[in-house]
């Protein structure tokens, strides 16, 4: 028997030998999407783990590793045009990985800015966040590619949610405008989030719009993409709808984790006392959800529900300690390799999954039962 803090420290130790001289960490391929990625994403994740390892052990080598990771994220290689972070190099997709890629890097820089008292990290994080156009009407952000090109709304809900969560972290050392945009997003969350009948969060972004708003949006260059999502909601064939539901089941815990971050940063916001959140949490605690995460390629092998669900349970004070501990142990049993101290089992993207242990840094220190 060991503890989660021991797992984090030992994995950070293993991570030290993976870090390159420029501070970067090995790149993966975005899990099931198989996108050629730059080191930016995994360096962002490992940065958080190194910070946690320093907090746990007070060993300077972890602080230095975190500092080196920050240096890489602030380098020209990570932001080649001085705009957004370059996360992937797939010629058929954007290089910023929508809002999602930026959220991961902003999350890491925001935490490092405070832990390392790094003013440049704070300034860059605020600058990149605010460079993304925010729609005052829909309370949503547009994507900005690495060369500064504005690409329109990110039409995936979890990307918008995670970008808001990263903004909540950035807000600690940023202009008031950052916090205000996140609060505006939270104010509109009940009309932005879309649920299945059982409380499962839908994957596509489909904000509530009446017929007049939809008609008006058709003539608006930026808003038109939201009309597309509304049309697709009704026109998708059954097979496509089943695939999307399976994806939503694999991403439900990922959404929960972002909601938990936001709730910790804005604990008094009224959205946390709505029926909306109650419905989401009720589904999360159901046996139906547990079964849905089994053999789902977007779940344990990619998004780690064993860290994400307990984070939400802790934050919103639901479920028992034993249930949370069970989720954590299930993820460790599935993914942790005790021989390497890395989260590399049961996945075809070992580099990315190893980096995603960072999500456990926000959890209580649970007992871990290794085989």
Swiss-Prot record:
Organism ancestry: Archaea, Methanobacteriati, Methanobacteriota, Stenosarchaea group, Halobacteria
Taxonomic source organism: Haloferax volcanii (strain ATCC 29605 / DSM 3757 / JCM 8879 / NBRC 14742 / NCIMB 2012 / VKM B-1768 / DS2)
Localisation per UniProt entry: Cytoplasm
N-terminal signal peptide: none
Transmembrane listed as a keyword: no
Disruption phenotype: Defects in N-glycosylation pathway, characterized by impaired addition of the fourth sugar of the pentasaccharide: both dolichol phosphate, the lipid carrier used in H.volcanii N-glycosylation, and modified S-layer glycoprotein Asn residues only present the first three subunits of the pentasaccharide.
Main location: cytoplasm
Region annotated Disordered, chain positions: 19-39
UniProt pathway annotation: Cell surface structure biogenesis; S-layer biogenesis
Protein name: Archaeal glycosylation protein Q
Its biological purpose: Putative isomerase involved in the N-glycosylation pathway. Required for the appearance of the methyl ester of hexuronic acid found at position four of the pentasaccharide N-linked to the S-layer glycoprotein. Either involved in preparing the third sugar for attachment of the fourth pentasaccharide subunit or processing the fourth sugar prior to its addition to the lipid-linked trisaccharide.
Any single Gene Ontology cellular-component annotation: cytoplasm
Documented effect of changing residue 52 to L: Defects in N-glycosylation pathway
A biological process term (GO) from this entry: S-layer organization
Record keyword Cytoplasm present: yes
Keyword entries, A-Z: Cytoplasm
